[in-house]
């Protein structure tokens, strides 16, 4: 996705505000720094507690929201279950924020970027990072958008200086994750990305780093052996099946545009294996394919499908996006995608279904033994194609099958331990659990007509060794599950 958006705002001075109180829960970084798991497929804290990345896309947060708005946005992200917000530090060179402050007042001489006595561009970014920490949210910090690198607005020497500036400013913040790239192929000025990434890593030894690629690419295509990359990211993008749009060079097979699960396998084909996630799937309420406002729009059920397909294929998390939120649309701000005058403001979009339904996926993944989970399509007999695909994953003593629109499935229960299994159906749109009963082993057929409601009626069949109690039989929602492991707080 390329962001080149019209901006019309009323400038206001920063005012004293009463920020919302911190949530009454432990700080995630009390578990130590984020690191890569021993099996190289997940993210975790130093004390062994799993970290399931659930990201929201807030690209233009630093540019378009004032202090009050930023606090409101981050508070609601936390309440909706998000633990990462992806932002652009620089969308342009220079970038202006809502207070009229610019990012590069003296070009790439960043010694003059933060003058005393001024609420500078960087002071406002500091505020956003600190408020995110207040809500236990990590900031996925895209240092500079790819279009600016492609246009030659920064060279390798400038990137090195910029990387040192960023690292020195944020290396001691607990809630930073560095993101190189920004909707760009890695072979476009790779010397700039190498210089920027290596400069940050030379100073900052506390935070993980990845790369956000162009649509239908994975960062592993260019950076699999880069010393600075800790985990991979792919952008499955915003196109429907068959929407090639005349591209002469196409990095995926025709008519596979929506199959975001395939990027996990293609990423892991590169060595060494690293964790991977979809950093930009189709956004809720954005025109299908982005650029034709007359197209239909991606719905809540679509964004759920992308999330479950990707995670059940082995992703270490998932990033959600919404057309209005990623642009931070509000009165006076023109949309870059859709029909101007008909788009909803970002703060209204936070009520949309898809935005509020991602937390059920996170809760489900943290309910089961985390690090033993693998994708395993052999669980299902005849797993279907396209929208009929049954996505399967399992641990040693549990298995899960996500169905987008299928009301029947044949499952091989011998793939997990236990002579008897307990079964549940989880509604992906509500997180509601229905206990289906206890049965034996072998290959079994499941008919879900009685528990599937609505259209498409997507959800997850859960089977657990009956000797385990990850979910109770009388449990009605996945949100009340107790995380399977609670390693000690390193500050205790």
Question: Which residues does each PLM region occupy?
Answer:
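Short strand-edge motifs at loop-to-beta-strand transitions and within beta-strands
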Residues: 444-446
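Bacterial N-terminal signal peptides
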Residues: 2-12
């Amino acid at each position: 996705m390329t962001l080149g958006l019209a901006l019309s705002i009323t400038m206001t001075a920063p005012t004293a505000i009463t920020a919302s109180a911190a949530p009454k829960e432990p700080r995630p970084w009390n578990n130590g720094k984020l690191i890569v798991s021993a099996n190289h497929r997940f993210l975790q804290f130093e004390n062994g507690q799993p970290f399931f990345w659930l990201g929201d896309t807030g690209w233009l947060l630093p540019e378009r929201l004032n202090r009050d708005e930023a606090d409101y946005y981050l508070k609601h992200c936390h309440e909706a279950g998000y633990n990462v917000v992806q932002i652009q530090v620089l969308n342009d060179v220079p970038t202006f924020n809502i207070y009229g402050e610019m990012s590069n007042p003296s070009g790439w001489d960043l010694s003059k970027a933060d003058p005393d006595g001024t609420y500078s561009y960087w002071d406002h970014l500091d505020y956003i990072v600190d408020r995110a920490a207040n809500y236990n949210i990590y900031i996925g910090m895209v240092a500079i958008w790819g279009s600016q690198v492609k246009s030659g607005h920064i060279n390798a020497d400038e990137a090195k200086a910029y990387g040192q500036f960023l690292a020195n400013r944020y290396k001691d913040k607990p809630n930073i994750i560095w993101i190189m790239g920004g909707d760009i192929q890695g072979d476009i000025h790779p010397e700039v990305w190498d210089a920027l990434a290596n400069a940050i890593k030379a100073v900052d030894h506390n935070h993980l780093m990845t790369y956000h690629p162009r649509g239908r690419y994975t960062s592993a295509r260019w950076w699999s052996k880069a010393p600075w990359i800790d985990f991979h990211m792919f952008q499955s993008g915003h196109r429907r099946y068959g929407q090639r749009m005349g591209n002469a060079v196409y990095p995926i097979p025709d008519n596979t545009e929506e199959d975001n699960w395939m990027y996990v396998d293609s990423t892991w084909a590169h060595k060494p294996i690293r964790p991977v996630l979809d950093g930009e799937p189709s956004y809720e309420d954005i025109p299908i394919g982005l650029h034709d406002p007359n197209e239909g729009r991606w719905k809540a059920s679509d964004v759920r499908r992308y999330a479950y397909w990707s995670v059940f294929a082995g992703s270490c998390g998932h990033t959600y996006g919404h057309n209005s939120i990623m642009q931070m649309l509000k009165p006076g701000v023109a949309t870059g995608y859709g029909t101007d005058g008909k788009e909803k403001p970002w703060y209204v979009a936070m009520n949309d279904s898809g935005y509020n339904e991602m937390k059920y996926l996170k809760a489900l993944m943290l309910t089961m033994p985390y690090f033993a989970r693998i994708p395993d399509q052999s669980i299902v007999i005849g797993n279907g194609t396209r929208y009929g695909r049954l996505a399967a994953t399992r641990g040693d003593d549990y298995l899960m099958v996500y169905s987008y629109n299928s009301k029947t499935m044949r499952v091989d229960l011998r793939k997990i331990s236990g002579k008897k299994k307990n079964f549940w159906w989880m509604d992906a749109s509500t997180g509601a659990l229905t206990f289906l009963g206890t049965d034996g082993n072998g290959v079994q057929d499941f008919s879900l007509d009685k528990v599937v409601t609505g259209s498409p009626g997507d959800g997850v069949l859960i089977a657990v060794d009956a000797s385990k109690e990850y979910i109770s039989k009388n449990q009605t929602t996945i949100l009340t599950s107790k995380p399977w492991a609670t390693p000690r707080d390193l500050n205790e």
